[in-house]
Regions:
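Bacterial N-terminal signal peptides that target proteins for export
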Residues: 1-9
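Short, low-complexity interaction segments enriched in Ser/Thr/Pro/Gly
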Residues: 3, 19-20
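Bacterial N-terminal signal peptides
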Residues: 9-17
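Extracytoplasmic copper-binding redox domains, predominantly the cupredoxin/blue-copper superfamily
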Residues: 21-254
Length: 254
């Protein structure tokens, strides 16, 4: 009888130990993922505006592409630093810098695509979210090179050769960075700028300077407009539910 009681006691202790070692329901070794904020289109507002260029915009400079016979056939052989029409300024990156609090938005699954066509990067300025894939394609029948030169720690330099009409090459950046330069080592006139931010609320101004940032929850925001040569401007703007708030920026031509 004493032996049976001792055996039962040991068995009970074993069950207690096993129960104590059991993982809580839902626990795992990986870190808890943040709860993403979804855009509420029933209340979302919009920031709309125009980027103006005060004064006479410098004339685009013609580029000598004679070093590559393929490139010399391109009609788009003018510089892209100052581009626009009717006083509007193109290729300005506009984004919401502050005002979203602790909201975290999902990274788009589709990549941002930059093509090398006519020996130019198209588009000249792009935006992406931190962690979003940026894909470079080569539609030209000539060799190109994608040389990305970040200045923020944690973002890795990329130096990629792409064969004529070759396969896309992609990179992902883990830190926010504005106006990250992209160059082609084979064609020194080729340049583009990549902007990486932490939310999906950004835009690039069109040829007439117009831009729109949609899907914003009602609130007050700090908005930044950044140009590759003319620098940054900042504004504070309040967006109401289902409202379009207007915010223009004016850069002085250099």
């Amino acid at each position: 009888m004493r032996f049976l009681m001792k055996t039962a006691t040991l068995a009970g202790l074993a069950l207690v130990v096993l129960a104590g070692c059991k993982k809580p329901a839902g626990s795992g070794s990986s870190e808890t993922k943040p709860a993403f904020t979804q855009i509420d289109w029933n209340t979302a507002g919009t920031i709309s505006g125009t980027i103006h260029c005060a004064g006479k915009m410098p004339e685009p400079e013609q580029i000598d592409m004679a070093q590559d016979p393929v490139c010399s056939l391109s009609p788009a052989n003018y510089s892209e630093q100052y581009v626009g029409k009717n006083g509007g300024l193109q290729n300005v990156f506009i984004y919401v810098k502050d005002g979203l609090g602790n909201k975290v938005y999902p990274v788009p699954s589709s990549p941002v695509v930059v093509d090398q066509k006519g020996c130019r990067y198209t588009p000249h300025v792009v935006g992406a979210m931190v962690g979003q894939k940026i894909s470079f394609t080569n539609s030209d029948p000539t060799m190109h090179n994608v040389h990305m030169i970040p200045t923020v720690g944690g973002n890795q330099t990329a130096d990629i050769s792409q064969a004529p009409n070759g396969q896309p090459e992609s990179r992902i950046f883990s830190k926010p960075e504005l106006m990250m330069p992209v160059r082609c080592n084979n064609h020194p006139w080729m340049q583009a700028f990549v902007n990486v931010v932490e939310n999906p609320f950004f835009a690039v101004s069109a040829s007439d300077g117009h831009f729109e940032i949609k899907g914003l929850p009602p609130g007050t925001y700090t908005v930044v407009a950044d140009h590759e040569v003319l620098g940054q401007q900042t504004a504070t703007i309040t967006v109401g539910a289902k409202q379009i708030a207007t915010q223009d920026f004016t850069f002085a031509a250099k």
